[in-house]
Design a protein with these regions (language model features):
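Hydrophobic transmembrane alpha-helices and their immediate loop junctions
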Residues: 1-196
Length: 196
């Protein structure tokens, strides 16, 4: 029973982290003039629209996973570089804001069930934000970098984007994943500690 309830709480935490992250991308793109995500029904906080089943299981088992990427057309932005950067960072920003809200809930609400769920939401939002800031396509960290490098290099990188899964697997197996992600997680926690 404990294991089942623990898994359910994890799923809630993951669903919230993924939903706010992808909504952040979709809504920021909408504000900047691109309604591609809205047309595909992705400008929503409904987890069913964003969750990838395999990515969900991967997050529960390996603590690293993925969601269905929100479709964005940067060519609809008035300024490609600025728009692409803002949209790339919007998901991570949404994760951090959500974590802050949950910290404040735990600070002022004393109810075990709510506190437990909020704690998982915090952990997964921090983890999802840090993971997405890695400068590897198709993650948000690369989205920011790609806005400022010549198009021909972008094309070259995206040509080999399918190899990203191999890179992630290698990072996990070798333990290098923690080496790269831990500093990002530490920075995010320093921000969150300001609200504790």
């Amino acid at each position: 029973m404990y294991i089942l309830s623990n898994i359910l709480v994890q799923i809630v935490g993951i669903a919230v982290a993924i939903s706010v992250h992808e909504f952040g991308h979709a809504y920021s793109a909408h504000l900047l003039g691109d309604d591609t995500a809205k047309m595909y029904g992705r400008m929503t906080l409904n987890p069913a629209k964003h969750l990838d089943i395999m990515g969900l299981f991967a997050m529960i088992i390996f603590h690293i996973g993925w969601a269905k990427p929100v479709p964005v057309n940067p060519n609809n932005f008035k300024n490609y570089k600025v728009g692409n950067t803002i949209v790339s960072l919007a998901g991570v920003t949404a994760n951090i804001i959500t974590a802050i809200i949950c910290i404040l809930i735990n600070k002022y609400v004393n109810m075990y069930a709510i506190n437990l769920i909020a704690q998982y939401v915090i952990v997964y939002n921090v983890g999802f934000a840090a993971f997405n800031l890695l400068p590897i396509p198709p993650l948000d960290g690369w989205g920011v970098i790609s806005s400022f490098i010549p198009y021909k290099y972008n094309e070259l990188v995206y040509k080999y984007e399918s190899m990203s899964s191999i890179i992630f697997l290698a990072l996990i197996i070798t333990g290098a994943y923690s080496f790269f992600v831990s500093p990002i997680i530490n920075i995010i926690w320093k921000i969150l500690y300001l609200f504790m």
